[in-house]
Amino acid sequence: MAIGRYGTLVFYILAGLAFVWSLEYFKHYTKNNYERFHCTAVVEPVQGTATVEKLSAVGGPPCDKRAELKLITQKLTQHFDPNKQPALFCIVENTSVESVHYPVSRTNKGPAGYIAYAGYEADRAAVHKYCEAHGAAVLHM
């Protein structure tokens, strides 16, 4: 009789631990794959430069300006390693887009709320040119 009670106790403890593990795994997965649930990153190389990229984010209804900014900063830190060489970037706000905006259709997600230009020190002049054209300050990383 005692073995059955202890077996039941062990079963419920393991079931509880499995539930907690699955919850933590889900939180970790959604944190690392934020763009899959909210926005989609759009990374376009800038013509005539070696490392400069134009980054933006578009998506469905949960992709508001806050989510776009979060995804752009996440992509900046993933794509540009300041340990290789210093990186420069600027983030330009599209003021014609509301903070909470919705896609035009399933295929047309509408304009991006933020656009970033980023590159390494080797393309310093190109980054400055694109950022100054939009009146944005160049930041160093």
Swiss-Prot record:
Positions in the Lumenal compartment: 27-141
Q: Which terms does the UniProt entry file under GO BP?
A: ceramide biosynthetic process
Described function: Component of the ceramide synthase complex required for synthesis of ceramides.
* Spans traversing the lipid bilayer: 4-26
Keywords from UniProt, A to Z, are: Endoplasmic reticulum, Glycoprotein, Lipid biosynthesis, Lipid metabolism, Membrane, Signal-anchor, Transmembrane, Transmembrane helix
Residues carrying covalently attached carbohydrate according to the record = 94
Q: Name one GO cellular component term.
A: endoplasmic reticulum membrane
Topology class, membrane: Single-pass type II membrane protein
Q: Can you state the subunit structure given in the record?
A: Component of the ceramide synthase complex.
Chief subcellular location equals: endoplasmic reticulum
- What does the record give under GO molecular function? sphingosine N-acyltransferase activity
Is Chloroplast a UniProt keyword of this protein?
Answer: no
Localization terms from the record: Endoplasmic reticulum membrane
Name the record gives this protein? Ceramide synthase subunit LIP1
- Per the UniProt topology annotation, the Cytoplasmic ranges are 1-3
Its family remark reads: Belongs to the LIP1 family.
